UniProtKB/Swiss-Prot annotation:
NCBIfam families xrefs: PRK00094.1-2 (NF000940), PRK00094.1-4 (NF000942), PRK00094.2-1 (NF000943)
Catalytic reaction annotation: sn-glycerol 3-phosphate + NAD(+) = dihydroxyacetone phosphate + NADH + H(+); sn-glycerol 3-phosphate + NADP(+) = dihydroxyacetone phosphate + NADPH + H(+)
The organism of origin for this protein: Bartonella bacilliformis (strain ATCC 35685 / KC583 / Herrer 020/F12,63)
InterPro entries registered for this protein in UniProt: 6-PGluconate_DH-like_C_sf, 6PGD_dom2, G3P_DH_NAD-dep, G3P_DH_NAD-dep_C, G3P_DH_NAD-dep_N, NAD(P)-bd_dom_sf
Keywords: Cytoplasm, Lipid biosynthesis, Lipid metabolism, NAD, NADP, Nucleotide-binding, Oxidoreductase, Phospholipid biosynthesis, Phospholipid metabolism
Protein transport as UniProt keyword: no
EC annotation from Swiss-Prot or TrEMBL: 1.1.1.94
Gene of this entry: gpsA
HAMAP family in alphabetical order: NAD_Glyc3P_dehydrog
GO cellular component: cytosol
Protein name in UniProt: Glycerol-3-phosphate dehydrogenase [NAD(P)+]
């Protein structure tokens, strides 16, 4: 089967490697893949002969399945530019909330593609470990279980896919955990200890559950791979960009410098802004997301953590 991956970042390349174990894959990206993320490219070149690097969007639209792994903030523009057929079968691997509108990924995508033709990937997964072929489990959220199973069947043996029907829950969990991961990095960067961090992460999980339930998500989704699983991974590892943003903020580094050093998007930054706007509008209590947004805007990380521990 032929699969097109849109997005040449670490996540897009990792998914290309994974799907290429069973399929012919092409990556479409506006970035120069040959010079970006060289360690990943070396592994791709050594382990797969089925990956084609493609720069032309038009020439990439002849695949049976499509995977989108670009920044959520660029997703709307991408759909407008791509002009995909309404019947295109798409797996969206982007995680976040659109900052300027405060809407979820599915709400953006269904303006261009029928929800029946959309699936959403979630769960604990670092690009580096996927490219190394290390085992992991992921969730595919969709209202169309047949399509979700079709994507699941294309995954390699080292990935165990689970089919879920809670689209909103998967989206909220995938987006919100990035914000809590920034908080986890700040907690570690300030050397507040494991007791404080355990309190922060457990309260963060409750916070994202309540936020998701407000929009109709299922509680069980947040206790599974898409919620707790992804949160525990992302908030505890240097492989996590959002966690490293938190570390940098705790050390009083400028956000611009932190992002430059990362070289990749950290979705939790924009997502914290979107969540804060939504919670203020809807009256949802989101203290951790609110404090993270204040830190991004210049508030002392230590003062914010102190505020949270007193609530």
């Amino acid at each position: 089967m032929k699969i097109t991956i849109f997005g040449g970042g670490a996540w897009g390349q990792a998914l290309a490697f994974a799907f290429a174990q069973k399929n012919e894959v092409q990556i479409v990206s506006r970035r120069n893949i040959s010079t970006a993320l060289m360690p990943l490219n070396e592994i791709l070149n050594k382990n797969s002969h089925r990956i084609i690097l493609q720069s032309s969007l038009e020439e990439s639209l002849n695949s049976e399945l499509f995977v989108i792994a670009i920044s959520v903030q660029a997703l709307r523009e991408w759909f407008i530019r791509a002009r995909l057929n309404q019947n295109s079968k798409i797996l969206i691997a982007s995680k976040g909330i659109e900052e300027k509108t405060g809407i979820f990924v599915s709400q953006i995508a269904k303006k261009f593609i029928s929800l029946e033709n959309l699936c959403f990937l979630a769960g604990p997964s670092f690009a580096k470990e996927i490219i190394l072929g290390l085992p992991c489990a992921l969730a595919i959220h969709s209202c169309n279980p047949i399509l979700a199973q079709k994507f699941a069947n294309q995954m390699p043996s080292f990935i165990k896919p689970y089919i879920e029907d809670d689209i909103i829950g998967g989206e909220v969990a995938s987006a919100y955990k990035n914000v809590i991961a920034i908080a986890g990095g700040i907690c570690d960067g300030l050397n507040l200890g494991q007791n404080a961090k355990a309190s922060l992460l457990s309260r963060g999980l409750v916070e994202m559950c309540k936020f998701g339930e407000y929009f109709g998500a299922k509680m069980q989704t947040f206790l599974g791979l898409s919620g707790a699983g992804d949160l525990f991974l992302t908030a505890n590892s240097l492989l996590s960009r959002n966690y490293r943003v938190g570390l940098g903020l705790a050390q009083n580094n400028r956000l611009e410098d932190i992002l430059r050093d990362l070289g990749e998007v950290a979705e939790g930054i924009k997502t914290s802004q979107a969540i804060t706007q939504i919670s203020e509008k809807e009256g949802i209590y989101t203290p951790i997301a609110t404090e993270i947004q204040k830190i991004i805007q210049g508030k002392s990380p230590l003062e914010s953590m102190s505020t949270l521990m007193k609530k």
